[in-house]
Protein backbone atom coordinates (compact mmCIF):
# COMPACT_ATOMS: atom_id res chain seq x y z
CA UNK A 1 0.00 0.00 0.00
CA UNK A 2 2.84 2.40 0.87
CA UNK A 3 4.51 1.64 -2.47
CA UNK A 4 1.20 2.28 -4.27
CA UNK A 5 0.91 5.69 -2.55
CA UNK A 6 4.47 6.55 -3.56
CA UNK A 7 3.71 5.66 -7.18
CA UNK A 8 0.53 7.75 -7.13
CA UNK A 9 2.41 10.68 -5.62
CA UNK A 10 5.15 10.41 -8.22
CA UNK A 11 2.60 10.18 -11.03
CA UNK A 12 0.78 13.25 -9.73
CA UNK A 13 4.03 15.18 -9.52
CA UNK A 14 4.93 14.15 -13.08
CA UNK A 15 1.51 15.23 -14.32
CA UNK A 16 1.93 18.60 -12.63
CA UNK A 17 5.31 19.07 -14.32
CA UNK A 18 3.88 18.11 -17.73
CA UNK A 19 0.78 20.29 -17.40
CA UNK A 20 0.53 23.30 -19.68
CA UNK A 21 0.96 26.78 -18.25
CA UNK A 22 -1.83 29.30 -17.73
CA UNK A 23 -0.08 32.58 -18.48
CA UNK A 24 -2.45 35.51 -18.04
CA UNK A 25 -3.60 37.19 -14.86
CA UNK A 26 -7.40 37.14 -14.50
CA UNK A 27 -7.25 40.43 -12.60
CA UNK A 28 -6.19 42.47 -15.65
CA UNK A 29 -8.95 44.92 -16.66
CA UNK A 30 -8.63 43.96 -20.34
CA UNK A 31 -8.96 40.22 -19.72
CA UNK A 32 -12.22 38.54 -20.73
CA UNK A 33 -13.31 36.22 -17.87
CA UNK A 34 -13.39 32.51 -18.70
CA UNK A 35 -12.24 33.14 -22.29
CA UNK A 36 -8.99 31.54 -23.36
CA UNK A 37 -6.39 31.22 -26.11
CA UNK A 38 -5.03 27.67 -26.24
CA UNK A 39 -1.69 27.19 -28.03
CA UNK A 40 -0.51 23.75 -29.11
CA UNK A 41 3.02 22.38 -28.95
CA UNK A 42 5.14 22.82 -32.08
CA UNK A 43 5.22 19.06 -32.64
CA UNK A 44 1.43 18.79 -33.02
CA UNK A 45 0.35 17.96 -36.57
CA UNK A 46 -2.67 19.42 -38.32
CA UNK A 47 -4.54 16.13 -37.97
CA UNK A 48 -3.70 15.89 -34.26
CA UNK A 49 -4.87 19.46 -33.81
CA UNK A 50 -8.21 18.76 -35.48
CA UNK A 51 -8.67 15.73 -33.25
CA UNK A 52 -7.82 17.77 -30.16
CA UNK A 53 -10.34 20.48 -31.07
CA UNK A 54 -13.04 17.83 -31.41
CA UNK A 55 -12.05 16.46 -28.00
CA UNK A 56 -12.15 19.91 -26.37
CA UNK A 57 -15.53 20.67 -27.93
CA UNK A 58 -16.96 17.39 -26.66
CA UNK A 59 -15.42 18.03 -23.25
CA UNK A 60 -17.22 21.35 -22.99
CA UNK A 61 -20.47 19.73 -24.07
CA UNK A 62 -20.15 17.12 -21.33
CA UNK A 63 -19.50 19.87 -18.77
CA UNK A 64 -22.63 21.74 -19.89
CA UNK A 65 -24.66 18.52 -19.63
CA UNK A 66 -23.55 18.07 -16.02
CA UNK A 67 -23.77 21.69 -14.92
CA UNK A 68 -26.42 23.12 -17.21
CA UNK A 69 -26.03 26.16 -19.45
CA UNK A 70 -23.77 28.73 -17.78
CA UNK A 71 -23.30 31.29 -20.54
CA UNK A 72 -19.97 29.84 -21.65
CA UNK A 73 -20.09 28.98 -25.34
CA UNK A 74 -17.13 26.65 -25.55
CA UNK A 75 -15.08 26.50 -28.74
CA UNK A 76 -14.87 29.76 -30.74
CA UNK A 77 -12.15 29.71 -33.43
CA UNK A 78 -9.31 27.48 -34.53
CA UNK A 79 -6.11 28.97 -35.95
CA UNK A 80 -3.64 27.47 -38.40
CA UNK A 81 -0.98 30.00 -39.36
CA UNK A 82 2.16 28.81 -41.12
CA UNK A 83 2.33 25.56 -39.12
CA UNK A 84 1.23 27.17 -35.84
CA UNK A 85 -1.91 25.76 -34.20
CA UNK A 86 -4.16 27.33 -31.57
CA UNK A 87 -7.81 27.81 -30.70
CA UNK A 88 -10.00 30.04 -28.58
CA UNK A 89 -13.12 29.54 -26.52
CA UNK A 90 -14.91 30.15 -23.24
CA UNK A 91 -14.69 27.26 -20.81
CA UNK A 92 -15.65 26.33 -17.25
CA UNK A 93 -12.76 25.74 -14.84
CA UNK A 94 -13.30 21.99 -14.94
CA UNK A 95 -12.87 21.95 -18.72
CA UNK A 96 -9.91 24.32 -18.54
CA UNK A 97 -8.14 21.98 -16.11
CA UNK A 98 -8.57 19.10 -18.56
CA UNK A 99 -7.19 21.22 -21.41
CA UNK A 100 -4.19 22.27 -19.31
CA UNK A 101 -3.42 18.62 -18.57
CA UNK A 102 -3.59 17.55 -22.22
CA UNK A 103 -0.14 16.60 -23.51
CA UNK A 104 -0.68 18.36 -26.86
CA UNK A 105 -1.12 21.80 -25.26
CA UNK A 106 1.86 24.13 -24.80
CA UNK A 107 0.18 26.93 -22.85
CA UNK A 108 -3.13 28.69 -22.27
CA UNK A 109 -3.69 32.42 -21.98
CA UNK A 110 -6.71 34.58 -21.23
CA UNK A 111 -8.29 36.30 -24.21
CA UNK A 112 -8.11 40.05 -23.82
CA UNK A 113 -8.98 43.33 -25.47
CA UNK A 114 -6.59 45.39 -27.57
CA UNK A 115 -7.19 48.94 -28.79
CA UNK A 116 -6.40 51.29 -31.64
CA UNK A 117 -3.30 53.40 -31.05
CA UNK A 118 -4.53 56.68 -32.48
CA UNK A 119 -6.77 59.55 -31.51
CA UNK A 120 -8.27 62.53 -33.32
CA UNK A 121 -6.51 65.81 -32.60
CA UNK A 122 -7.56 68.80 -34.71
CA UNK A 123 -9.33 69.58 -37.96
CA UNK A 124 -7.84 71.19 -41.06
CA UNK A 125 -4.24 70.78 -39.90
CA UNK A 126 -1.61 70.54 -42.68
CA UNK A 127 -0.25 67.13 -43.66
CA UNK A 128 3.50 66.76 -43.38
CA UNK A 129 4.39 63.06 -43.14
CA UNK A 130 4.75 62.41 -46.88
CA UNK A 131 7.35 65.10 -47.37
CA UNK A 132 9.21 64.14 -44.23
CA UNK A 133 9.80 60.48 -45.11
CA UNK A 134 11.05 61.35 -48.61
CA UNK A 135 13.77 63.77 -47.46
CA UNK A 136 16.74 63.23 -45.20
CA UNK A 137 16.39 66.71 -43.77
CA UNK A 138 13.31 68.39 -42.37
CA UNK A 139 11.59 71.43 -43.84
CA UNK A 140 9.88 70.44 -47.12
CA UNK A 141 6.34 69.36 -48.00
CA UNK A 142 7.16 67.87 -51.41
CA UNK A 143 6.73 64.11 -51.61
CA UNK A 144 9.37 62.44 -53.81
CA UNK A 145 8.85 58.75 -54.54
CA UNK A 146 9.50 55.93 -56.99
CA UNK A 147 6.89 55.99 -59.75
CA UNK A 148 5.91 52.37 -59.12
CA UNK A 149 4.60 53.46 -55.72
CA UNK A 150 3.74 49.98 -54.45
CA UNK A 151 2.39 48.63 -57.74
CA UNK A 152 1.84 44.87 -57.47
CA UNK A 153 1.90 44.95 -53.65
CA UNK A 154 -1.19 44.23 -51.53
CA UNK A 155 -1.85 46.07 -48.28
CA UNK A 156 -3.97 44.32 -45.63
CA UNK A 157 -5.48 46.82 -43.20
CA UNK A 158 -6.42 44.80 -40.09
CA UNK A 159 -8.39 47.43 -38.26
CA UNK A 160 -11.89 48.90 -37.78
CA UNK A 161 -12.69 48.33 -41.44
CA UNK A 162 -12.00 50.55 -44.46
CA UNK A 163 -14.30 52.77 -46.51
CA UNK A 164 -13.30 51.00 -49.72
CA UNK A 165 -15.33 53.47 -51.81
CA UNK A 166 -13.39 56.51 -50.63
CA UNK A 167 -11.98 58.28 -53.72
CA UNK A 168 -8.51 58.40 -52.20
CA UNK A 169 -8.18 54.66 -52.88
CA UNK A 170 -8.94 55.17 -56.56
CA UNK A 171 -10.85 51.92 -56.91
CA UNK A 172 -7.92 49.85 -55.61
CA UNK A 173 -9.62 48.84 -52.34
CA UNK A 174 -11.76 45.73 -51.83
CA UNK A 175 -13.53 44.22 -48.84
CA UNK A 176 -11.79 41.17 -47.44
CA UNK A 177 -13.48 39.83 -44.31
CA UNK A 178 -15.18 40.85 -41.07
CA UNK A 179 -14.55 38.76 -37.96
CA UNK A 180 -16.45 41.03 -35.54
CA UNK A 181 -19.92 39.64 -34.90
CA UNK A 182 -22.75 42.15 -34.91
CA UNK A 183 -20.97 44.77 -37.03
CA UNK A 184 -21.44 45.77 -40.65
CA UNK A 185 -18.86 45.59 -43.42
CA UNK A 186 -17.87 49.23 -43.12
CA UNK A 187 -15.72 51.58 -41.05
CA UNK A 188 -17.89 53.57 -38.66
CA UNK A 189 -14.96 54.48 -36.42
CA UNK A 190 -12.70 55.95 -39.12
CA UNK A 191 -9.38 54.66 -37.80
CA UNK A 192 -9.03 51.88 -40.37
CA UNK A 193 -9.71 54.17 -43.33
CA UNK A 194 -7.24 56.75 -42.01
CA UNK A 195 -4.42 54.25 -41.51
CA UNK A 196 -5.00 52.52 -44.86
CA UNK A 197 -5.02 55.83 -46.73
CA UNK A 198 -1.84 56.91 -44.93
CA UNK A 199 -0.16 53.84 -46.36
CA UNK A 200 -1.81 53.68 -49.79
CA UNK A 201 -3.99 56.73 -50.54
CA UNK A 202 -3.73 58.47 -53.91
CA UNK A 203 -3.49 61.88 -52.23
CA UNK A 204 -2.57 61.17 -48.62
CA UNK A 205 -0.66 57.92 -48.97
CA UNK A 206 2.81 56.61 -49.73
CA UNK A 207 2.25 53.46 -51.81
CA UNK A 208 -0.21 55.10 -54.19
CA UNK A 209 -0.56 52.13 -56.53
CA UNK A 210 -0.83 49.30 -54.00
CA UNK A 211 -3.93 47.14 -53.78
CA UNK A 212 -5.89 47.47 -50.53
CA UNK A 213 -7.83 44.79 -48.63
CA UNK A 214 -10.14 45.71 -45.75
CA UNK A 215 -10.01 43.29 -42.82
CA UNK A 216 -12.34 44.25 -39.97
CA UNK A 217 -11.06 42.89 -36.65
CA UNK A 218 -11.92 45.78 -34.31
CA UNK A 219 -15.39 46.97 -33.37
CA UNK A 220 -16.92 50.34 -34.18
CA UNK A 221 -15.39 51.83 -31.03
CA UNK A 222 -11.83 50.82 -31.86
CA UNK A 223 -11.52 47.83 -29.52
CA UNK A 224 -11.06 44.18 -30.36
CA UNK A 225 -10.37 40.75 -28.93
CA UNK A 226 -7.17 38.94 -29.75
CA UNK A 227 -9.25 35.85 -30.51
CA UNK A 228 -10.80 37.81 -33.40
CA UNK A 229 -7.59 39.48 -34.53
CA UNK A 230 -5.80 36.13 -34.69
CA UNK A 231 -8.59 34.83 -36.93
CA UNK A 232 -8.11 37.87 -39.15
CA UNK A 233 -4.38 37.14 -39.39
CA UNK A 234 -5.11 33.56 -40.40
CA UNK A 235 -7.48 34.84 -43.10
CA UNK A 236 -4.83 37.22 -44.47
CA UNK A 237 -2.23 34.47 -44.77
CA UNK A 238 -4.75 32.18 -46.48
CA UNK A 239 -5.86 34.97 -48.83
CA UNK A 240 -2.29 35.92 -49.75
CA UNK A 241 -1.45 32.26 -50.35
CA UNK A 242 -4.53 31.73 -52.52
CA UNK A 243 -3.76 34.85 -54.58
CA UNK A 244 -0.08 33.88 -54.89
CA UNK A 245 1.08 37.18 -53.39
CA UNK A 246 3.16 35.79 -50.54
CA UNK A 247 6.29 37.94 -50.61
CA UNK A 248 4.32 40.82 -52.12
CA UNK A 249 2.06 41.73 -49.22
CA UNK A 250 2.08 44.18 -46.31
CA UNK A 251 -0.10 43.91 -43.20
CA UNK A 252 -0.60 46.78 -40.78
CA UNK A 253 -1.61 46.45 -37.12
CA UNK A 254 -2.17 49.90 -35.61
CA UNK A 255 -3.23 48.47 -32.26
CA UNK A 256 -1.76 48.06 -28.81
CA UNK A 257 -2.49 46.28 -25.55
CA UNK A 258 -0.85 44.29 -22.79
CA UNK A 259 1.61 41.60 -23.80
CA UNK A 260 -0.07 38.38 -24.95
CA UNK A 261 2.29 35.54 -25.86
CA UNK A 262 -0.25 33.71 -28.03
CA UNK A 263 -0.96 36.90 -29.97
CA UNK A 264 2.74 37.58 -30.47
CA UNK A 265 3.23 34.07 -31.81
CA UNK A 266 0.34 34.47 -34.25
CA UNK A 267 1.74 37.79 -35.51
CA UNK A 268 5.24 36.34 -35.84
CA UNK A 269 3.95 33.34 -37.78
CA UNK A 270 2.10 35.73 -40.09
CA UNK A 271 5.34 37.57 -40.78
CA UNK A 272 7.28 34.34 -41.29
CA UNK A 273 4.67 33.21 -43.80
CA UNK A 274 6.00 35.94 -46.10
CA UNK A 275 4.05 39.09 -45.23
CA UNK A 276 5.70 42.32 -44.07
CA UNK A 277 4.03 43.32 -40.79
CA UNK A 278 4.14 46.91 -39.52
CA UNK A 279 2.87 47.50 -35.98
CA UNK A 280 2.31 50.40 -33.60
CA UNK A 281 4.46 50.83 -30.49
CA UNK A 282 1.51 52.15 -28.45
CA UNK A 283 0.58 55.50 -26.91
CA UNK A 284 1.37 55.12 -23.20
CA UNK A 285 4.78 56.86 -23.11
CA UNK A 286 6.28 53.68 -21.70
CA UNK A 287 8.52 50.81 -22.75
CA UNK A 288 6.78 48.85 -25.50
CA UNK A 289 8.51 45.63 -24.44
CA UNK A 290 5.41 44.76 -22.42
CA UNK A 291 2.99 45.50 -25.27
CA UNK A 292 1.49 43.38 -28.03
CA UNK A 293 1.92 43.27 -30.94
CA UNK A 294 4.87 45.67 -30.50
CA UNK A 295 6.95 43.01 -28.73
CA UNK A 296 6.35 40.27 -31.32
CA UNK A 297 9.40 38.94 -33.16
CA UNK A 298 9.70 39.52 -36.88
CA UNK A 299 7.61 42.71 -37.05
CA UNK A 300 8.61 46.29 -37.81
CA UNK A 301 7.52 48.25 -34.75
CA UNK A 302 7.03 51.99 -35.26
CA UNK A 303 7.14 54.78 -32.69
CA UNK A 304 5.86 58.28 -33.45
CA UNK A 305 7.56 61.62 -34.12
CA UNK A 306 6.36 65.20 -34.29
CA UNK A 307 6.84 67.60 -37.20
CA UNK A 308 10.05 68.75 -35.42
CA UNK A 309 11.55 65.24 -35.39
CA UNK A 310 11.02 64.90 -31.65
CA UNK A 311 9.59 61.79 -30.08
CA UNK A 312 5.86 62.44 -29.68
CA UNK A 313 5.08 62.80 -25.98
CA UNK A 314 2.54 59.97 -26.07
CA UNK A 315 4.69 57.50 -28.00
CA UNK A 316 5.99 54.32 -26.45
CA UNK A 317 9.68 53.56 -26.81
CA UNK A 318 12.21 50.83 -25.97
CA UNK A 319 14.37 48.19 -27.57
CA UNK A 320 11.49 46.61 -29.53
CA UNK A 321 11.00 49.84 -31.49
CA UNK A 322 12.70 49.40 -34.85
CA UNK A 323 12.14 52.85 -36.31
CA UNK A 324 10.41 56.18 -35.80
CA UNK A 325 7.89 57.62 -38.27
CA UNK A 326 5.55 60.63 -38.46
CA UNK A 327 2.69 60.19 -36.02
CA UNK A 328 1.42 63.52 -34.73
CA UNK A 329 -1.11 65.63 -36.63
CA UNK A 330 -1.37 63.34 -39.66
CA UNK A 331 -3.99 64.21 -42.27
CA UNK A 332 -5.58 61.32 -44.15
CA UNK A 333 -8.86 60.00 -45.53
CA UNK A 334 -11.81 59.21 -43.29
CA UNK A 335 -15.16 57.58 -44.16
CA UNK A 336 -17.83 59.20 -46.34
CA UNK A 337 -15.41 61.01 -48.64
CA UNK A 338 -14.00 63.02 -45.74
CA UNK A 339 -10.57 63.72 -44.32
CA UNK A 340 -9.37 64.05 -40.76
CA UNK A 341 -6.31 64.59 -38.63
CA UNK A 342 -5.20 61.93 -36.17
CA UNK A 343 -2.21 61.40 -33.92
CA UNK A 344 -0.70 58.25 -32.48
CA UNK A 345 1.68 55.43 -33.20
CA UNK A 346 -1.30 54.14 -35.20
CA UNK A 347 -0.32 56.78 -37.76
CA UNK A 348 3.39 55.94 -37.60
CA UNK A 349 2.89 52.24 -38.38
CA UNK A 350 1.18 52.72 -41.79
CA UNK A 351 3.94 55.14 -42.80
CA UNK A 352 6.28 52.19 -42.29
CA UNK A 353 3.91 49.86 -44.12
CA UNK A 354 3.56 52.30 -47.00
CA UNK A 355 7.28 52.91 -47.44
CA UNK A 356 7.79 49.16 -47.08
CA UNK A 357 5.35 48.54 -49.92
CA UNK A 358 7.13 51.05 -52.17
CA UNK A 359 10.51 49.42 -51.57
CA UNK A 360 9.09 45.94 -52.14
CA UNK A 361 7.76 47.12 -55.51
CA UNK A 362 10.84 49.08 -56.59
CA UNK A 363 13.63 46.86 -55.27
CA UNK A 364 12.02 43.46 -54.85
CA UNK A 365 13.10 43.23 -51.22
CA UNK A 366 11.77 40.17 -49.40
CA UNK A 367 9.42 40.85 -46.46
CA UNK A 368 11.82 39.20 -44.01
CA UNK A 369 14.59 41.65 -45.02
CA UNK A 370 12.48 44.77 -45.38
CA UNK A 371 12.61 46.16 -41.84
CA UNK A 372 16.40 45.85 -41.79
CA UNK A 373 16.52 47.72 -45.11
CA UNK A 374 14.33 50.50 -43.70
CA UNK A 375 16.67 50.81 -40.73
CA UNK A 376 19.71 50.80 -43.03
CA UNK A 377 18.50 53.70 -45.19
CA UNK A 378 16.78 55.64 -42.37
CA UNK A 379 17.46 59.28 -41.61
CA UNK A 380 17.47 61.02 -38.26
CA UNK A 381 18.38 61.55 -35.55
CA UNK A 382 15.10 61.66 -33.65
CA UNK A 383 15.40 63.95 -30.65
CA UNK A 384 14.92 62.44 -27.18
CA UNK A 385 13.92 58.98 -28.49
CA UNK A 386 13.65 57.38 -25.06
CA UNK A 387 15.71 54.92 -23.08
CA UNK A 388 17.30 52.06 -25.08
CA UNK A 389 15.53 53.27 -28.23
CA UNK A 390 16.73 53.82 -31.78
CA UNK A 391 16.91 57.38 -33.10
CA UNK A 392 16.36 56.28 -36.71
CA UNK A 393 13.64 58.07 -38.69
CA UNK A 394 11.78 56.48 -41.60
CA UNK A 395 13.07 57.45 -45.07
CA UNK A 396 12.04 56.10 -48.48
CA UNK A 397 15.44 56.35 -50.13
CA UNK A 398 14.43 58.99 -52.66
CA UNK A 399 17.90 60.54 -52.70
CA UNK A 400 16.53 63.89 -51.54
UniProtKB/Swiss-Prot annotation:
Signal peptide as annotated in the record: 1-19
Localization: Secreted
Keyword Secreted: yes
GO CC, alphabetical: extracellular region
Residues forming the catalytic site: 159, 191, 346
Pfam families, A to Z: Inhibitor_I9, Peptidase_S8
GO biological process: proteolysis
Residue ranges the record assigns to the propeptide: 20-117
InterPro entries for the chain: PCSK9_ProteinaseK-like, Peptidase_S8/S53_dom, Peptidase_S8/S53_dom_sf, Peptidase_S8_subtilisin-like, Peptidase_S8_subtilisin-rel, S8pro/Inhibitor_I9, S8pro/Inhibitor_I9_sf
UniProt main location, coarse: secreted
Domain of life: Eukaryota
Protein name, UniProt field: Subtilisin-like protease 11
Amino acid sequence: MALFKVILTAFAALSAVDAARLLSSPNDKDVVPNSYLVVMKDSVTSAEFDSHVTWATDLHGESVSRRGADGLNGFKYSYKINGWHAYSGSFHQETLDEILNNDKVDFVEHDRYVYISGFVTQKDAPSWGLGRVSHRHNGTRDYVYDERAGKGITFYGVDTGIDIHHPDFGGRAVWGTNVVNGTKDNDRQGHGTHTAATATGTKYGLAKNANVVAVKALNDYGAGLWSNIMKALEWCVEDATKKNIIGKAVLNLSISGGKVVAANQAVTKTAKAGIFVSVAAGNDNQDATNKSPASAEGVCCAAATTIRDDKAKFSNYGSVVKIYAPGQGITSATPNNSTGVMSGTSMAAPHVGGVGATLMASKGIAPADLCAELIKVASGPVQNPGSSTTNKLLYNGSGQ
